[in-house]
Amino acid sequence: MPSWKGQSRGNVLGYKIFVFTLKHLGLSFAYFILVFVAFYYFLFSNKSSKSTYYYFREILKYSSFKAKWNVYKNYFVFGQILLDKFAILGGLKGKFSYNLDGEHHLRQMASNTGGIIINAHIGNFEIAGQLLERLNTKINVLMLDAEHQNIKKYLTNVMVNRDVQIIPIQADYSHIVPISEALINKELIAMAGDRFIEESKVVEIDFMGQKAVFPTGPFYLAARFGVPVTFAFAMKESRTHYHFFASPPEKVERYKDPEKQEKELKRFVEKFACEFERIIKMYPLQWFNYYQFWKEE
Protein backbone atom coordinates (compact mmCIF):
# COMPACT_ATOMS: atom_id res chain seq x y z
CA MET A 1 0.00 0.00 0.00
CA PRO A 2 1.49 3.39 -0.99
CA SER A 3 2.50 5.37 2.07
CA TRP A 4 4.62 8.41 2.69
CA LYS A 5 8.00 7.89 4.35
CA GLY A 6 7.90 11.03 6.45
CA GLN A 7 10.15 13.35 4.48
CA SER A 8 9.14 16.18 2.19
CA ARG A 9 11.29 17.65 -0.55
CA GLY A 10 13.49 20.34 0.96
CA ASN A 11 15.49 20.64 4.18
CA VAL A 12 16.82 23.24 6.59
CA LEU A 13 19.84 24.07 4.41
CA GLY A 14 17.58 24.66 1.43
CA TYR A 15 15.34 26.89 3.54
CA LYS A 16 18.36 28.92 4.71
CA ILE A 17 19.48 29.41 1.12
CA PHE A 18 16.00 30.65 0.18
CA VAL A 19 15.94 33.15 3.05
CA PHE A 20 19.48 34.40 2.31
CA THR A 21 18.62 34.90 -1.36
CA LEU A 22 15.44 36.78 -0.52
CA LYS A 23 17.14 39.09 1.97
CA HIS A 24 20.17 39.95 -0.14
CA LEU A 25 19.11 39.53 -3.77
CA GLY A 26 15.35 39.99 -3.78
CA LEU A 27 12.37 37.91 -4.88
CA SER A 28 12.77 38.51 -8.63
CA PHE A 29 16.36 37.30 -8.67
CA ALA A 30 15.41 34.31 -6.53
CA TYR A 31 12.74 33.40 -9.09
CA PHE A 32 15.40 33.60 -11.83
CA ILE A 33 17.67 31.16 -9.97
CA LEU A 34 14.76 28.72 -9.79
CA VAL A 35 14.99 28.16 -13.55
CA PHE A 36 18.23 26.26 -12.96
CA VAL A 37 17.31 24.72 -9.60
CA ALA A 38 14.13 23.23 -11.07
CA PHE A 39 16.09 21.83 -14.00
CA TYR A 40 18.51 20.15 -11.58
CA TYR A 41 15.64 18.41 -9.76
CA PHE A 42 14.06 17.48 -13.08
CA LEU A 43 17.27 15.70 -14.13
CA PHE A 44 18.32 14.05 -10.89
CA SER A 45 15.25 13.49 -8.68
CA ASN A 46 14.19 10.33 -10.44
CA LYS A 47 11.81 8.97 -7.81
CA SER A 48 9.77 12.15 -7.36
CA SER A 49 9.86 12.89 -11.09
CA LYS A 50 8.47 9.42 -11.82
CA SER A 51 5.53 9.97 -9.46
CA THR A 52 4.85 13.43 -10.87
CA TYR A 53 5.06 12.18 -14.45
CA TYR A 54 2.54 9.45 -13.62
CA TYR A 55 0.17 12.11 -12.26
CA PHE A 56 0.34 14.21 -15.42
CA ARG A 57 0.47 11.31 -17.92
CA GLU A 58 -1.86 8.68 -16.45
CA ILE A 59 -4.22 10.72 -14.26
CA LEU A 60 -4.56 13.99 -16.18
CA LYS A 61 -4.00 12.22 -19.54
CA TYR A 62 -1.42 14.68 -20.87
CA SER A 63 0.73 13.69 -23.84
CA SER A 64 4.16 12.29 -23.03
CA PHE A 65 5.93 15.54 -23.96
CA LYS A 66 3.43 17.73 -22.11
CA ALA A 67 3.67 15.50 -19.03
CA LYS A 68 7.49 15.78 -18.97
CA TRP A 69 7.35 19.53 -19.48
CA ASN A 70 4.88 19.85 -16.63
CA VAL A 71 7.14 17.82 -14.33
CA TYR A 72 9.74 20.56 -14.78
CA LYS A 73 7.14 23.31 -14.34
CA ASN A 74 5.88 21.61 -11.18
CA TYR A 75 9.38 21.81 -9.64
CA PHE A 76 9.64 25.46 -10.70
CA VAL A 77 6.28 26.39 -9.17
CA PHE A 78 7.19 24.48 -6.00
CA GLY A 79 10.30 26.65 -5.71
CA GLN A 80 8.20 29.79 -6.19
CA ILE A 81 5.85 28.60 -3.46
CA LEU A 82 8.76 28.10 -1.04
CA LEU A 83 10.18 31.53 -1.84
CA ASP A 84 6.79 33.16 -1.36
CA LYS A 85 6.37 31.33 1.94
CA PHE A 86 9.62 32.62 3.35
CA ALA A 87 9.04 36.11 2.00
CA ILE A 88 5.74 36.25 3.88
CA LEU A 89 7.00 34.48 7.00
CA GLY A 90 9.93 36.89 7.05
CA GLY A 91 7.73 39.99 7.06
CA LEU A 92 7.30 40.76 3.34
CA LYS A 93 3.55 40.17 3.32
CA GLY A 94 2.97 43.60 1.79
CA LYS A 95 4.46 42.42 -1.49
CA PHE A 96 1.55 40.01 -1.98
CA SER A 97 -2.17 40.44 -2.59
CA TYR A 98 -4.84 37.86 -1.90
CA ASN A 99 -8.57 37.32 -1.74
CA LEU A 100 -10.17 35.22 0.95
CA ASP A 101 -13.04 33.04 -0.18
CA GLY A 102 -14.63 31.58 2.95
CA GLU A 103 -12.77 33.52 5.63
CA HIS A 104 -16.04 33.85 7.53
CA HIS A 105 -16.13 30.06 7.92
CA LEU A 106 -12.83 30.13 9.80
CA ARG A 107 -13.97 33.13 11.80
CA GLN A 108 -17.09 31.17 12.79
CA MET A 109 -14.94 28.26 13.99
CA ALA A 110 -12.52 30.53 15.84
CA SER A 111 -15.29 32.36 17.68
CA ASN A 112 -17.10 29.19 18.75
CA THR A 113 -15.42 25.86 19.42
CA GLY A 114 -12.21 26.08 17.43
CA GLY A 115 -11.71 23.34 14.88
CA ILE A 116 -9.57 21.46 12.41
CA ILE A 117 -8.53 22.87 9.04
CA ILE A 118 -7.81 20.04 6.63
CA ASN A 119 -5.56 20.98 3.74
CA ALA A 120 -3.15 19.16 1.42
CA HIS A 121 0.28 19.48 -0.15
CA ILE A 122 -1.13 21.75 -2.80
CA GLY A 123 -0.65 25.48 -3.18
CA ASN A 124 0.88 27.35 -0.27
CA PHE A 125 -1.22 26.71 2.81
CA GLU A 126 1.68 27.49 5.16
CA ILE A 127 1.25 31.18 4.40
CA ALA A 128 -2.45 31.14 5.28
CA GLY A 129 -1.68 31.41 8.99
CA GLN A 130 0.19 34.64 8.33
CA LEU A 131 -2.54 35.98 6.04
CA LEU A 132 -5.30 35.09 8.51
CA GLU A 133 -3.77 36.82 11.53
CA ARG A 134 -6.81 39.08 11.73
CA LEU A 135 -8.84 36.10 12.96
CA ASN A 136 -7.29 36.86 16.37
CA THR A 137 -6.76 33.22 17.22
CA LYS A 138 -3.77 30.91 17.23
CA ILE A 139 -3.34 28.56 14.28
CA ASN A 140 -1.42 25.35 14.99
CA VAL A 141 0.12 23.59 12.00
CA LEU A 142 0.85 19.86 12.31
CA MET A 143 4.10 19.04 10.56
CA LEU A 144 4.35 15.47 9.35
CA ASP A 145 8.04 15.46 8.47
CA ALA A 146 11.06 13.39 9.46
CA GLU A 147 13.08 16.62 9.71
CA HIS A 148 10.39 18.45 11.71
CA GLN A 149 12.51 19.38 14.75
CA ASN A 150 15.22 21.29 12.87
CA ILE A 151 12.73 22.85 10.46
CA LYS A 152 10.52 23.89 13.38
CA LYS A 153 13.43 25.68 15.04
CA TYR A 154 14.37 27.51 11.89
CA LEU A 155 10.81 28.49 10.96
CA THR A 156 10.26 29.81 14.49
CA ASN A 157 13.25 32.12 14.06
CA VAL A 158 12.07 33.63 10.77
CA MET A 159 8.32 33.84 11.41
CA VAL A 160 6.92 37.28 12.13
CA ASN A 161 3.44 36.20 13.20
CA ARG A 162 3.89 34.26 16.44
CA ASP A 163 0.22 33.24 16.45
CA VAL A 164 1.24 30.41 14.12
CA GLN A 165 2.57 27.43 16.09
CA ILE A 166 4.14 24.34 14.54
CA ILE A 167 3.30 21.01 16.22
CA PRO A 168 5.58 18.17 15.04
CA ILE A 169 3.94 14.75 14.89
CA GLN A 170 5.78 12.34 17.21
CA ALA A 171 6.12 8.57 16.99
CA ASP A 172 4.95 8.22 20.61
CA TYR A 173 1.76 10.24 19.89
CA SER A 174 2.78 12.90 22.43
CA HIS A 175 1.59 15.49 19.90
CA ILE A 176 -1.96 14.65 21.04
CA VAL A 177 -1.30 16.73 24.18
CA PRO A 178 -0.69 20.08 22.41
CA ILE A 179 -3.53 19.28 19.99
CA SER A 180 -5.90 18.70 22.91
CA GLU A 181 -4.74 21.88 24.64
CA ALA A 182 -5.18 23.90 21.46
CA LEU A 183 -8.72 22.65 20.86
CA ILE A 184 -9.69 23.20 24.50
CA ASN A 185 -8.51 26.80 24.04
CA LYS A 186 -10.72 27.11 20.92
CA GLU A 187 -7.73 27.41 18.62
CA LEU A 188 -7.44 26.14 15.05
CA ILE A 189 -5.48 23.05 14.02
CA ALA A 190 -4.27 22.74 10.42
CA MET A 191 -3.23 19.34 9.11
CA ALA A 192 -2.81 17.59 5.77
CA GLY A 193 -5.40 15.12 4.54
CA ASP A 194 -3.38 13.72 1.62
CA ARG A 195 -0.50 12.04 3.48
CA PHE A 196 -0.17 9.13 5.83
CA ILE A 197 2.66 7.07 7.25
CA GLU A 198 2.81 3.33 7.86
CA GLU A 199 0.45 2.00 10.56
CA SER A 200 -1.92 4.94 10.08
CA LYS A 201 -5.63 4.16 9.82
CA VAL A 202 -6.70 4.67 6.22
CA VAL A 203 -9.60 4.16 3.85
CA GLU A 204 -9.54 3.34 0.14
CA ILE A 205 -11.70 5.47 -2.17
CA ASP A 206 -11.99 6.46 -5.82
CA PHE A 207 -9.91 9.55 -6.52
CA MET A 208 -9.44 11.13 -9.94
CA GLY A 209 -10.39 7.93 -11.71
CA GLN A 210 -8.26 5.45 -9.78
CA LYS A 211 -8.15 3.85 -6.35
CA ALA A 212 -6.24 5.81 -3.71
CA VAL A 213 -5.78 5.61 0.04
CA PHE A 214 -6.41 8.52 2.42
CA PRO A 215 -5.91 8.80 6.19
CA THR A 216 -8.91 8.95 8.53
CA GLY A 217 -6.87 10.43 11.39
CA PRO A 218 -7.83 14.11 10.89
CA PHE A 219 -11.52 13.24 10.97
CA TYR A 220 -11.14 10.91 13.94
CA LEU A 221 -9.56 13.77 15.90
CA ALA A 222 -12.48 16.03 14.99
CA ALA A 223 -14.97 13.40 16.17
CA ARG A 224 -13.04 12.70 19.35
CA PHE A 225 -12.80 16.35 20.39
CA GLY A 226 -16.24 17.33 19.09
CA VAL A 227 -15.01 20.13 16.82
CA PRO A 228 -15.93 20.92 13.21
CA VAL A 229 -13.70 20.52 10.17
CA THR A 230 -13.22 22.74 7.16
CA PHE A 231 -11.31 22.11 3.94
CA ALA A 232 -8.98 24.97 3.07
CA PHE A 233 -6.44 25.71 0.34
CA ALA A 234 -4.27 28.74 -0.54
CA MET A 235 -3.49 28.80 -4.26
CA LYS A 236 -1.04 30.93 -6.23
CA GLU A 237 -2.83 32.69 -9.09
CA SER A 238 -0.13 35.04 -10.33
CA ARG A 239 3.37 36.17 -9.43
CA THR A 240 2.27 37.90 -6.21
CA HIS A 241 -1.41 37.03 -5.81
CA TYR A 242 -3.03 34.19 -3.84
CA HIS A 243 -6.59 32.91 -3.58
CA PHE A 244 -7.67 31.32 -0.30
CA PHE A 245 -10.59 28.86 -0.22
CA ALA A 246 -12.35 27.51 2.89
CA SER A 247 -15.46 25.33 2.99
CA PRO A 248 -18.33 25.64 5.51
CA PRO A 249 -17.45 23.91 8.80
CA GLU A 250 -19.06 20.52 9.42
CA LYS A 251 -19.11 18.32 12.49
CA VAL A 252 -17.92 14.71 12.33
CA GLU A 253 -20.23 12.61 14.47
CA ARG A 254 -18.81 10.23 17.06
CA TYR A 255 -20.42 6.80 17.40
CA LYS A 256 -19.92 4.00 19.90
CA ASP A 257 -20.61 1.47 17.16
CA PRO A 258 -17.26 0.94 15.31
CA GLU A 259 -18.98 0.17 12.03
CA LYS A 260 -21.00 3.39 12.13
CA GLN A 261 -17.89 5.34 13.05
CA GLU A 262 -15.92 3.92 10.12
CA LYS A 263 -18.74 4.84 7.73
CA GLU A 264 -18.80 8.38 9.11
CA LEU A 265 -15.04 8.76 8.74
CA LYS A 266 -15.14 7.42 5.18
CA ARG A 267 -17.98 9.81 4.34
CA PHE A 268 -15.83 12.77 5.35
CA VAL A 269 -12.75 11.44 3.60
CA GLU A 270 -14.80 11.27 0.40
CA LYS A 271 -16.02 14.84 0.96
CA PHE A 272 -12.45 16.02 1.37
CA ALA A 273 -11.27 14.07 -1.69
CA CYS A 274 -14.06 15.60 -3.78
CA GLU A 275 -13.07 19.15 -2.83
CA PHE A 276 -9.38 18.31 -3.19
CA GLU A 277 -9.97 16.98 -6.70
CA ARG A 278 -11.83 20.15 -7.64
CA ILE A 279 -8.88 22.29 -6.54
CA ILE A 280 -6.35 20.04 -8.30
CA LYS A 281 -8.22 20.40 -11.60
CA MET A 282 -8.21 24.18 -11.19
CA TYR A 283 -4.49 24.32 -10.34
CA PRO A 284 -2.88 21.10 -11.70
CA LEU A 285 0.69 22.40 -11.39
CA GLN A 286 0.39 23.13 -7.69
CA TRP A 287 0.01 19.65 -6.24
CA PHE A 288 3.44 18.81 -4.85
CA ASN A 289 3.03 15.10 -4.35
CA TYR A 290 6.47 13.56 -4.64
CA TYR A 291 5.72 9.98 -3.74
CA GLN A 292 3.67 7.07 -5.07
CA PHE A 293 0.03 8.00 -4.46
CA TRP A 294 -2.25 5.77 -6.53
CA LYS A 295 -2.28 2.03 -6.02
CA GLU A 296 -1.92 1.33 -9.74
CA GLU A 297 1.38 3.16 -10.01
Language-model features: locations:
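Residue-level "edge-of-site" marker
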Residues: 35, 69-70, 145, 172, ...
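Non-catalytic C-terminal accessory region of glycerolipid acyltransferases
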Residues: 111-112, 134, 161, 173-297
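Membrane-anchoring hydrophobic helices of lipid-metabolizing enzymes
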Residues: 1-119, 163
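Short, flexible loop segments at the rims of nucleotide/cofactor-binding pockets, characterized by
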Residues: 92-98, 165-170, 208-209, 265
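Catalytic core of membrane glycerolipid acyltransferases/transacylases, capturing the structured
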Residues: 65, 70, 113-171, 196-203
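Soluble or luminal CAZymes and related metallo-dependent hydrolases
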Residues: 13, 48, 98, 171, ...
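Short amphipathic alpha-helical segments and helix-helix/interface helices
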Residues: 103-107, 129, 133, 152-156, ...
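Conserved beta-strand termini and adjacent loop/short-helix elements that scaffold enzyme active sites
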Residues: 101, 142-144, 169, 247-249, ...
